[in-house]
């Protein structure tokens, strides 16, 4: 099995005029990026050949300057081969805003799909506070995120995305995640997964994932309110191996629980 990996993160605030620049990112290229991630052991265990592209992480800040973003996103897309890979693993934030573009995650995934098409599975790991546009589940075959706030499961989240990607490759499946939304706006850091209403919602998501046959992933994203976009806010992405109707029903149920 041969997979390409990449990571581009910056939790954005579209309400500030101060741009985030390339110099604000911690960068690692090629094999050096594996030291920044927490998936090396599983890659070795499964004897997966890795095509590393770019790791770029910045602290939360304003919109990423367009030219700098295009260079960074291009570093990932250009590093993914057109042929000879079985899948793509990405570690993104989910609330990156880019000057003149909008969602940095959606743009990156669009560029990637333009290059590799839709017959290669793409798995994405994100932050719990991801503001996912409707494009995200249309462009990725699996989307997961942190399941703790405050965040204490970075490694588990990265591994979960990799494990799902391995399943997709081994079973030759291309799942189609489904998304639903809750029409509320809550300051992200005020929400903790150990307290209501998230405690019950997270428990139900875990039950769905555990008990429903063929369920690949049930993810709760609380979103964050500093992205001035229509897709800002809590969103729920559910991935079933083959049944999109079941996935949508589960996503809708979680949204109603908020």
Residue ranges and their predicted role:
Residues 81, 114-117, 145-148, 163-174, ...:
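Generic secondary-structure signature for well-ordered alpha-helical cores
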Residues 54-75:
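Charged, often glycine-rich, active-site loop that binds/positions anionic groups
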Residues 39-41, 73-83:
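Short, charged beta->alpha transition segments
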């Amino acid at each position: 099995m041969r997979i390409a990996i990449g990571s581009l993160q910056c939790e954005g605030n579209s309400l500030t005029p101060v741009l985030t620049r390339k110099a604000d990112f911690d960068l690692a290229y090629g094999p050096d990026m594996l030291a920044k991630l927490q998936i090396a052991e599983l890659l070795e265990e499964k004897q997966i050949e890795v095509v590393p592209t770019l790791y770029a992480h910045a602290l939360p800040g304003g919109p990423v300057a367009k030219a700098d973003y295009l260079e960074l996103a291009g570093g990932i897309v250009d590093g993914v081969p057109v042929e000879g890979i079985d899948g793509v693993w990405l570690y993104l934030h989910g609330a990156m805003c880019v000057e003149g573009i909008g969602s940095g995650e959606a743009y990156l995934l669009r560029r990637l799909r333009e290059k590799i098409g839709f017959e290669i599975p793409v798995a994405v790991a994100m932050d719990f506070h991801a503001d996912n546009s409707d494009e995200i589940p249309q462009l990725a075959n699996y989307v997961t995120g942190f399941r703790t706030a405050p965040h204490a499961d970075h490694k588990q989240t990265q591994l979960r995305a990799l494990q799902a990607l391995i399943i997709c490759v081994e079973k030759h499946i291309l799942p189609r995640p489904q998304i639903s939304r809750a029409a509320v706006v809550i300051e992200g850091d005020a929400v903790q997964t150990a307290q209501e209403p998230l405690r019950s919602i997270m428990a139900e998501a875990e039950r769905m994932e555990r008990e429903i046959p063929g369920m690949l992933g049930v993810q709760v994203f609380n979103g964050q309110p500093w992205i001035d976009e229509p897709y800002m806010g809590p969103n729920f992405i559910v991935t079933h191996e083959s049944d999109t109707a079941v996935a949508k029903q589960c996503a809708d149920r979680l949204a109603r629980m908020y």
